[in-house]
Amino acid sequence: STVLDGVSGMNVISPTWFFLSDNEGNFVSIGSKDYVEQAHSRGLEVWALLDNFTYDVNTKEILSYTSKRANLISGLVNEALALGVDGINVDLEQVSTEAGEDYVEFLRELSISCRANNLVLSVDNYVPKNYNAHYNWKEQGIVADYVIIMGYDEHYGGSQEPGSVAS
């Protein structure tokens, strides 16, 4: 709770709680119901973040199979509901060009399940460039509730000037 003391103007917090852990679509969760309850008591929504860079996984292997995507989606939604979070924030990075269509299909399928369970779906993205066009931001905008562009390089850990690392 002390992290949020004095914070104003914020309505969503997205803790990194879900980590892809193998190539079958399983993940590790470090989510906390108590954290969610505290955030809700402060008027904040909680969107649990899924990442693919904590464990050594092959994202293409997971996304290429309907059964593995279904396993991941079912697990994510069930865990989100068990924790009482308001949404799921997808931060899958370094998705290969070859996996682009499967990635977008995963987002389509996840969006259906999220909507059916009243969960917000947001997707984190690099700044759009030609080399990452396979992330298909137009389609993301159709299926996700929020498409987030991660802007970096404003400040860094050793920077002489304090400030955010992204805006």
Question: How does the language model describe each region?
Answer:
Residues 42, 83, 116-119:
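Helix C-cap/helix->beta junction micro-motif
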Residues 11, 86, 145:
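Receiver (REC) domain switch/active-site residues of two-component response regulators
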Residues 2-7, 77, 134-143:
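Mature extracellular/periplasmic domains of secretome proteins
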Residues 23, 97-167:
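Substrate-binding surface in catalytic domains of secreted glycosidases
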Residues 17, 48-52, 92-94, 123-127, ...:
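A cross-domain feature marking catalytic cores of carbohydrate-active enzymes
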Residues 1-75:
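Glycan-recognition patch characteristic of GH18 chitinases/ENGases
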Residues 13, 90, 147:
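Conserved, mostly hydrophobic/aromatic
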Residues 32-37, 73-80, 104-111, 137:
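Generic structural signal for well-ordered alpha-helices
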